[in-house]
Every structure is written in structure tokens, then in C-alpha cells.
Amino acid sequence: MALTQDEDKPWKTDLARKSAQRREQVLVEIEESIKKAPSFEEALRVAVETMKKKFARYSSVTAWVADGDGLVVHMALERPQGPERVPTDSGPIADAAHAHGPTMVSDLNGSALWSQVGLTTGSVMVAPVRTEAGLWALLEVWSDFRDAFTPQDVKLAERLAAGLAKKTPSA
């Protein structure tokens, strides 16, 4: 019996290409909406709502905003029960906030740190929105599936965070 290679399955390549094209279309749509938004808060709202609506694999999308020495939930769509405020000096969300790019955890099962913020299963991706003035917000995308995020999802989160950073009052 001969083993089949991916080249023998053109439908796989076609499906991956269509998925990448769709992701790019959604990204452009969100970037345009961010540019047109009258304020940073409105841009955050549009980004969260559009990401949740367009990507079924995203079980929850949350925007955290910097508030003094902590981060506060600005908007959450279908996020599991968890704190509304977290410190920026400890915990998994704080660690993600200090990163220079998106942070991804592919399996949350058994992670005591993430369970403290309400996420016990699946996977999570967190992208900091920062400017030269510092941290402004975080985009948190949670999926109840393990390994839900691809490198393209990470690039999408990175580009959205960069677009949102341009919308901040300090930009």
C-alpha cells in the first residue's frame, strides 16, 4: 500500500489557501474599521466584536485596558467567569502584557496560573497593544480547543495590536 503525500491531496492545499485568504480579508476589514473608529475605545470594541463574529474557533475575545497598576476588562464576549481586574506585576496576563509580541499557550489543562484568571481548558493567545508611552491594552483570544491557534492567527493578533496602537491618544 502506497503512502499518500500532501501533494496527492490538492483539496488540502486549496483549503489552506482559502483559509489564509479569508483570514487576510477579515484582517483588512478589521484594520479599516479601526482606522475609521472615532476613538481608541471604539476601535477596541469593533476589533473584539468582529474577531468573535468572524472566527468560530475563537470561543471568547476579551479586551483588557491598562488602569493604574492593573489591567481591567474593557469588553468581553463569552469569556469564562474570572476576575475583572488583574495586577500588571504578577500572573499570566501580566506576563503576556510584558511580552513584545503575542503570547500563545496551546494547552491550558492543568495550568494553575491561567485557572486563576478563569481559563482552565483549551488554548489562549494574548497580544499586547503598546506604544512608546507604554502598555495601553491587551487582546485576549481564548478557544476551548487545544492547539487552536496557528502561526497565521498569531500574525493576525500582532497586526491588530499594531493597528490599535496607532489609534491610541499618544500615537
Protein language model annotation of sequence segments:
Residues Q81-T103, N109-G110:
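Acidic/proline- and glycine-rich, intrinsically disordered low-complexity segments
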Residues M1-K36, S170:
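Signal-transmission linkers at sensory-effector interfaces
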Residues S60, V126, L138:
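Short hydrophobic/aromatic beta-strand element in the GNAT-like acyltransferase core
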Residues G122-R130:
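A short, aliphatic-rich beta-strand micro-motif
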Residues L138-D147:
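Short beta-strand-to-loop transition segments that serve as allosteric relay/switch motifs
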Residues T131, F149-P169:
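Amphipathic alpha-helical "output/dimerization" segments
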Residues L135:
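Glycine-rich acetyl-CoA-binding "A-motif" of GNAT/NAT acetyltransferases
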Residues R23, V28, E32-H74:
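Helix-loop-beta substructure at the N-terminus of cytosolic sensory domains
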